């Protein structure tokens, strides 16, 4: 009995694993094909569509069928044409709806970015919207494939040629040239492609710099004093420690005014170049030009463990330095914008999901860049084209049937191609730091050396003290703040 129970449990587990392995996959209507080879028979590298798959894309299949057509599915099922309201039931037919055994999902390829040279905002926009090969033609063909009429000028028979580009407020309008007259229904009503709502987002990973000019360290101050041992025994178990805060002053210039429009999506840290230590941060969602200089403070320390003979003193020297660095820099900013198509849809076929045939005037806006919403996202609509009712805008399956999958993939890849603009300028920084604490040869104390000086630092009452003049105001003017000297017992004697 126990073995039977275990066997039954194994079958249940095996069945569950098989069910997981055979999870439903999307059926892309543009890859369906009708074979007239008999019930349940498909051509090479195709298989019959089953009942569940046909149900998931029922409206698409029925839309490709004749009024009273009946076509076969897998396992003895059939689907009936629009005259039968697309009913799916057991039955027989002489032809079969089939699907590839190795379907192509047909993702939109991602092309390398189109780089626009640095310039001010109008320069960058102008270069983009006047680029015939990389912008005007791809967007014109998008409008044409979606069913917009007259996407070309009067002096050319081809889509996207003889196009005029005009300034429109803060944006641009691309439209076929209307000079010289034309023939055809409403041929003067050219489709307009409006480009507007430009935005620029800094790409921190794109940082590059030119030749670095870095000065050798420059001595700005030498502090000299004494470590004094008033006791009758040598002192060697103490650390002399210099602590200070130093500021690094930095500035950047921006070559063009586009930097005022560029924002940082996330908190941004300036990359380190050379030996100058910086900790520059620009907050998220700030203009790149909002912070063109400042100062960062770092706390530093230096230590030495001197050996001072009995009733002796040794000279102590601390040298303070500064260093400069400068270089030209470049970042890239990701350019995003709205692409609005305005015109009337062709009566002979258009991709609006209801496929109107009364030549309606139609406006639709796509966002080229970061995702905003479903209605404006080409990639979202394309990826979800296999779900009837989810995409209530454009019928991308229709565009594939009319123009071919590879044609649509190529066109949409060019429309969605990332665009980047150069952000250039010059960066400079100055930092301060202390060199090592230097110790000289011991000198015997004079007979009156027990008289303490006001600026001495005691070594925990053990006879070791420091006599080193520190002018806080002077040191602050040199970029060194909160300067202190201390004598403490060594931790690892």
UniProtKB/Swiss-Prot annotation:
- Asked whether the keyword Ligase is assigned, the reply is no
The UniProt GO MF terms for this protein read: identical protein binding; toxin activity
Q: Pfam families attached here?
A: Aerolysin, APT
Which interval of the chain is the signal sequence?
1-23
Chief subcellular location: secreted
Q: Which residues does the propeptide include?
A: 446-493
Which parts of the sequence are annotated with region: Interaction with host N-linked glycan? Answer: 68-84
The record places the site described as Important for heptamerization at 374, 390
Compartments where found: Secreted; Host cell membrane
Give, from the UniProt record, the effect of changing residue 330 to A: No effect on heptamerization
A GO CC term assigned to this protein in UniProt: membrane
Altering residue 305 to A: what's the impact?
Impairs heptamerization
Effect of altering residue 221 to A?
Impairs heptamerization
**Which residues of this protein are annotated with the site description Important for oligomerization?**
155
An annotated GO BP = symbiont-mediated cytolysis of host cell
Region spans: Interaction with glycans from host GPI-anchor: 346-355
Domain of life according to the entry: Bacteria
Carries keyword Manganese? no
Question: Post-translation: what modifications?
Answer: Proteolytic cleavage and subsequent release of the propeptide trigger a major conformation change, leading to the formation of a heptameric pre-pore that then inserts into the host membrane.
User: Tell me, how does this one assemble?
Assistant: Homodimer in solution; homoheptamer in the host membrane. After binding to GPI-anchored proteins in target membranes and proteolytic removal of the C-terminal propeptide, the protein assembles into a heptameric pre-pore complex. A further conformation change leads to insertion into the host membrane.
Family, similarity comment:
Belongs to the aerolysin family.
Comment field on protein domains: The C-terminal propeptide is required for normal protein folding and secretion; it maintains the aerolysin precursor in its soluble form and prevents premature heptamerization and pore formation.
**Protein function:** Secreted, cytolytic toxin that forms pores in host membranes after proteolytic removal of a C-terminal propeptide, leading to destruction of the membrane permeability barrier and host cell death. The pores are formed by transmembrane beta-strands and are approximately 3 nm in diameter.
Which protein are we looking at?
A: Aerolysin
């Amino acid at each position: 009995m126990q073995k039977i129970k275990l066997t039954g449990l194994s079958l249940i587990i095996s069945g569950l694993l098989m069910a997981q392995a055979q999870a439903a996959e999307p059926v892309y209507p543009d890859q369906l094909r009708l074979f007239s080879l008999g019930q349940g028979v498909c051509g090479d590298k195709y298989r019959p569509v089953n009942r569940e798959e046909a149900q998931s894309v029922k409206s698409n299949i029925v839309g490709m069928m004749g009024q009273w057509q009946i076509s076969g599915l897998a396992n003895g099922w059939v689907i009936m044409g629009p005259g039968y309201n697309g009913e799916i039931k057991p039955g027989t037919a002489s032809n079969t709806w089939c699907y590839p055994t190795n379907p192509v999902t047909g993702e939109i390829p991602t092309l390398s970015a189109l780089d626009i040279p640095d310039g001010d905002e109008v320069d960058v926009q102008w270069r983009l919207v006047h680029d015939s090969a990389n912008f005007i033609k791809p967007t014109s063909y998008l409008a044409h494939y979606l069913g917009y009429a007259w996407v070309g000028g009067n002096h050319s028979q081809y889509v996207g040629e003889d196009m005029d580009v005009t300034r429109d407020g803060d944006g641009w309008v691309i439209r076929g040239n209307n000079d010289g007259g034309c023939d055809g229904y409403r041929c003067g009503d050219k489709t307009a492609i409006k480009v507007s709502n430009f935005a620029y987002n800094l790409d921190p990973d794109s940082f590059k710099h030119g030749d670095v000019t870095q000065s050798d360290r420059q001595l700005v101050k030498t502090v000299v004093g004494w470590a004094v041992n008033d006791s009758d025994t040598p002192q060697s178990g103490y650390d002399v420690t210099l602590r200070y805060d130093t500021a690094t002053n930095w500035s950047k210039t921006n070559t063009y005014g586009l930097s005022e429009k560029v924002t940082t999506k996330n908190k941004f840290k300036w990359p380190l170049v050379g030996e100058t230590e910086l900790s520059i941060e620009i907050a998220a969602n700030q203009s790149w030009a909002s912070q063109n200089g400042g100062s960062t403070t770092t706390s530093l320390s230096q230590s030495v463990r001197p050996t001072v003979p009995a009733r002796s003193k040794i000279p102590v020297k601390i040298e303070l330095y500064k260093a400069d660095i400068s270089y030209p820099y470049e970042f890239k900013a990701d350019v995003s914008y709205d692409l609005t198509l305005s015109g009337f849809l062709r009566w002979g076929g258009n991709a609006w999901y209801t496929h109107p045939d009364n030549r309606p005037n139609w406006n639709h806006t796509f966002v080229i860049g970061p995702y905003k919403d479903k209605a404006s996202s080409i990639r979202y609509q394309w990826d979800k084209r296999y779900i009837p009712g989810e995409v209530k805008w454009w019928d991308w399956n229709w565009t594939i049937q009319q123009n071919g999958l590879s044609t649509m993939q190529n066109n949409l890849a060019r429309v969605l191609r990332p665009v980047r603009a150069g952000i250039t300028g010059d960066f400079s920084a100055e930092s301060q730091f202390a060199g090592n604490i230097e110790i000289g040869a011991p000198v015997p104390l004079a007979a009156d050396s027990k008289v303490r000086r006001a600026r001495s630092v005691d070594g925990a009452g053990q006879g070791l003290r420091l006599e080193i003049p520190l002018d806080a105001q002077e040191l602050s003017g040199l970029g060194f703040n909160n300067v202190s000297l201390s004598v403490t017992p060594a931790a690892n004697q």
